[in-house]
């Protein structure tokens, strides 16, 4: 099986098992012998609790092997799926990855691709471009060159625990943040750069699900998952955030959620995201940086999300429904006889936002633990993560939850 190389090594000091298909040797075609080598890597990873990195560059399978080839693919899929949630799995696609091989690669926790790589389940090779895979949310990181793609895989490994029994990795040196102080109205990326250690945010799926920003960052040296929800959260963004939170939960990585969103665009996907947050037992700290109304608050920040700590900026707005609808529902009679109904309506909405929808009101009712100023966000989040680092939760015995998929 010279068309594939397997072994182990250290990535930034972290042990890992690896396999790499060689597209220049028989096209890297999958065979029974190659499958046995790869399956052995997965079995060793399971025994030792070590991450697996697979480098894909193969034209497909050896058709001459017929049923043996099908069985070989099936064994790899089964072993890989059984390893899911036990050790991190990263696929690095540098060349063709077509048909069943694509199923194996896409089943990893994260998929990193170079610009010229191909990834599709269609054996004809159609719709296989890296850009298409990124647009569909299958590719998490797309880089121009093979070298850049491999470097991103290295950064991912450094951000992740070795297995599901280890805690979140922490840097030897405490990180610092030199970003400008936060101010009201800051966008998601500005908030993230202001709470994360300098140059540590590694974004995933940037061009999929535009109303959710996800990725890993260091906060005072501790690795954590970051989710920033904004605007109206569409279906792709719900799926993107849900899968990311599920990964963090599987490996006990703390999740910091930043919320500035008005609502959901898809009930089905909103249910998926809500179930994910509610079920996750990892450390969860939420900061409402802007708007958080009704279902969004309940699903991502409130008791329904099972958040450990929920904080809000003093300028934030928390309400069962949008302030515009709530103000008219409660105070519409105050517009009777108004000579300027449009202007007076705006005043009523603003009054509702600064009174009943204010975070101080939510804190008084026990729905928020702390009201903070923007420039306190990094320090407050880090302190909460530190205090919650010993969190332990017991769950009911069951095979798994039946969430919307």
Ranges and model annotations:
Residues 1-405:
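Ligand-binding clefts of soluble mixed alpha/beta catalytic domains
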């Amino acid at each position: 099986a010279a068309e594939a190389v397997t072994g182990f090594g250290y990535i930034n000091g972290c042990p890992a098992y690896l396999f790499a298909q060689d597209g220049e040797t028989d096209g890297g075609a999958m065979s029974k012998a190659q499958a046995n080598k790869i399956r052995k890597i997965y079995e060793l990873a399971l025994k030792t609790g070590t991450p697996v990195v697979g480098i894909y560059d193969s034209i497909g399978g050896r058709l001459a092997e017929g049923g043996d080839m099908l069985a070989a693919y099936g064994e790899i899929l089964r072993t890989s799926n059984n390893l899911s949630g036990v050790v991190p799995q990263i696929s690095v696609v540098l060349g063709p990855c077509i048909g069943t091989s694509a199923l194996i690669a896409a089943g990893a926790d994260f998929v990193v691709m170079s610009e010229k790589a191909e990834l599709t389940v269609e054996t004809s090779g159609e719709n296989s471009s890296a850009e298409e895979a990124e647009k569909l949310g299958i590719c998490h990181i797309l880089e121009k060159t093979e070298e850049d793609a491999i470097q991103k895989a290295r950064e991912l490994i450094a951000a992740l625990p070795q297995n599901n029994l280890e805690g979140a990795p922490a840097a030897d040196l405490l990180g610092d943040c030199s970003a400008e102080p936060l101010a009201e109205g800051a966008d998601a990326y500005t908030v993230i750069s202001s709470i994360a250690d300098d140059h540590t945010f590694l974004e995933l799926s940037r061009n999929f699900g535009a109303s959710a920003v996800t990725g890993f960052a260091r906060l005072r040296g501790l690795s954590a998952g970051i989710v920033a929800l904004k605007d109206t959260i569409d279906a792709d963004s719900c799926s993107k955030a849900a899968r990311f939170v599920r990964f963090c939960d599987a490996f006990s990585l703390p999740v910091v959620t930043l919320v500035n969103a008005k609502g959901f665009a898809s009930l089905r996907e909103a249910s998926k995201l809500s179930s994910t947050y509610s079920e996750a037992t990892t450390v969860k700290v939420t900061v409402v940086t802007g708007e958080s109304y009704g279902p969004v608050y309940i699903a991502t920040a409130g008791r329904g999300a099972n958040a450990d700590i929920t904080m809000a900026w003093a300028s934030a707005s928390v309400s069962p429904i949008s302030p515009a609808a709530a103000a008219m529902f409660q105070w519409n009679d105050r517009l009777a006889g108004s000579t300027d109904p449009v202007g007076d309506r705006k005043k009523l909405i603003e009054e509702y936002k600064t009174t009943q929808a204010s975070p101080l009101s939510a804190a008084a009712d026990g729905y928020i633990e702390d009201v903070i100023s923007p420039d306190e966000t990094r320090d407050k989040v880090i302190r909460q993560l530190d205090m919650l680092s010993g969190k332990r939760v017991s769950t009911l015995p069951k095979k798994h939850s039946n969430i919307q998929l």
